[in-house]
């Protein structure tokens, strides 16, 4: 580091020590996020030949506001990471300080550091949840939900802001074992048992078909329908990872 001639302590080396000699380093970059310095290493390790046995050959997942993730097998994940009490206290302190003063600048720096901490926490939870989902199924089917549009069409802007829906969707889309259905598939309205279409309001949490009397949790019903639609069209010519309704 320019201007620093003494040795600096480096935290997190235990992440690399477990690989011993089976690791090759390529590049190293020093990153400054405005608060702390980080060393970003690009390296190669031997591929793990372990054959993973997953519980389900295929699952559907429904992203939502009430429950962050609902799986077709009934498993639900409800995650919300809002502003910390420490951040709220710092914001109140900032309001009583003179803009541009030394104390004001110190508080601004603390606020920025707390925001970085919250962002890192959201990223960590999203990474762990996506890893968990990918470890329980060979194929995951999800819908191309327009999460940003939910802010305008619902009164849940704060819940969406505190959720990690965008991170989950983005990370899952990178996997070649995740199938993304077009947003126009009627996964909530359609009854795969009898073919009936039933419109639901946002506060309707139970799907009950008036024709065949099928009754199911709304989100679990949608997740199972994603699997149904995928299996109906997966063998069509030209089908790719993003399946569209034609």
Which residues does each predicted region cover?
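Acidic carboxylate diad motif detector
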Residues: 1-31, 162
